[in-house]
Curated annotation (Swiss-Prot):
It comes from Rhizobium rhizogenes (strain K84 / ATCC BAA-868). Part of the 50S ribosomal subunit. This is Large ribosomal subunit protein uL24. NCBIfam families: rplX_bact (TIGR01079). PANTHER family: MITOCHONDRIAL RIBOSOMAL PROTEIN L24. GO terms for biological process: translation.
Length: 102
């Protein structure tokens, strides 16, 4: 089970976008990376093809999972733990102890 999943609201802990928050669009568990909406935006030069025009495209690049933390109910970054509730393994916020709904 992953600590950060698609749809989670996260805050960036390190790097050029430190302190910014966003929603996780994609998680790549094999690379330990995630793509966050509106964070770590890069510009790529697109060559013209038969279907696409040439130009500069902005898109989100991936961030390492160690640089992300889930945002708790009160808006502060929290670490994630696991607990078994009613026979199911669930994610729990370390700061408040609340179950993180997935």
């Amino acid at each position: 089970m992953q600590k950060i999943r698609k749809g989670d609201k996260v805050v960036v802990l390190a790097g050029k976008d430190k302190g910014r928050t966003g929603e996780v669009i994609q998680v790549m568990p094999k690379e330990d990376r995630a793509v966050v909406r509106g964070v770590n935006v890069i510009k790529r030069h697109q060559r013209q093809t038969q279907t696409q025009e040439a130009g500069i495209i902005s898109k989100e690049a991936s961030l390492h999972l160690s640089n992300l933390a889930i945002v708790d109910k009160d808006g502060k970054p929290t670490r994630v733990g696991f607990k078994v509730v009613e026979g199911k393994k669930v994610r729990v916020a370390k700061t408040s102890g609340e179950v993180i709904d997935g």
